[in-house]
Amino acid sequence: MGRRFAAVAIVALGFGARAQDAAARPLVTRVHGIATGIAACWHPPHDDDQVTVRTSFTREGAVIGEPRIVFVQSSGGRADDAALADSMKAAMRDCTPLHFSARLGSAIAGQVLDIRFIGPTRATIVAPP
């Protein structure tokens, strides 16, 4: 009985921490905020690396499925492209779910978005495919 209670308590604490993390994230009210929210968590190997990722989100700001890297250009050369793609996948995993406003979530839920990142400070939503 004691072990079961301890296991339940640990799981509950984990869910509480995750909910607290989501609440601490800034509210995203515009489409461009999606790109800047993810860019804030991205740590590319070089400052002028470029990545375009294709993804979609739920109303609540969670990624639907696996984000697809559609373009990678590392300033370190082709040998660094895999590490660059991995850094973007890590940012998508670690930075989501984003905290969408109800209005934004309703507008973009399920829509495919291409997000272009140029270094850690420039990010834009490009025309959907």
Language model regions located:
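Bacterial N-terminal signal peptides that target proteins for export
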Residues: 1-6
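Conserved "boundary/linchpin" sites in short secondary-structure elements
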Residues: 36-43, 56-75, 89-129
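Cleaved targeting-peptide boundary
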Residues: 19-29
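An anionic, turn-rich surface loop/hairpin at beta-sheet edges
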Residues: 78-84
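Hydrophobic h-region of N-terminal signal peptides that target proteins for export
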Residues: 8-19
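Short, small/polar residue-rich loop motifs at catalytic or cofactor-binding pockets
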Residues: 46-51
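Short hydrophobic/aromatic-rich motifs at helix boundaries and adjacent loops
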Residues: 9, 25, 60-64
